[in-house]
Amino acid sequence: MVTWGITALGHDASITVLEDSKILFAAHSERYSRIKNDEYLNEQIVNDALQYGIPQKIIWYEKPLLKKTRQIYAGQWSEALSNKNLPKNYLKQFFDFIEPMPEIKYVPHHKSHAAAGAYTSPFSKATVVVLDAIGEWDSCSVWKYDRSITASPLKKLQSSRYPHSFGLLYSAFTQRCGLKPNEEEYILMGMSAY
C-alpha cells in the first residue's frame, strides 16, 4: 500500500512516500520553492512524489478540527473559522485527477513527532519526549515506545497543554532578542554558550 505522510499549512511543508513500511521518497517544499520554512506544497514536489505511486492513504500530521478548538480558545477567530486551512480542501488541488480522493487519516501533532523519533531510531523500546511550541493542544508530551506491541507501539503517558509551553517561551525570547520566532531559535541556542 502506498501511503503519503504530509505536513503543510503551518511551516516546513513536506511529503514522505511509504510503501508498506519502506520510505521511497521524502522532501521539503523549501527545497523546491526556495522559500525558507515554506508552508505550502507545490506541483513539483507533488509530481515527484507521484512517481512513486498514487497514495491509497494520506497521513496528515495533525488533527485540524481539534486545533481549531485551541484557536477559538486563544481568540484566533479568523484561523478557526477558515475552511482554507482544512487539509481535504487544500489537497483537492493536487488530486483533482483522482476520484475519489485518497483517504486522509489525521494523527495528533505530538504523536507525529513521537513516531518520527521512535520509528527511525535503532531502539526497540524507548521513552520519547516531544517538546515544541504547540500541537493541537499539547506543548510537551511523554510517550512509551515498544516495537514488540504491533497494534499500537506508541502510547502517550503524560502531556502538558497550551498555554503552558516551553517552546512558546523560547520563541518569545527569540523574538525579544530581535530574531525571527519559529526560525531563528538556533541562533539563540548558539548564543547561550556565551
Pin down the residues of each PLM region.
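Short acidic/glycine-rich loops and adjacent helix/strand connectors
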Residues: 1-194
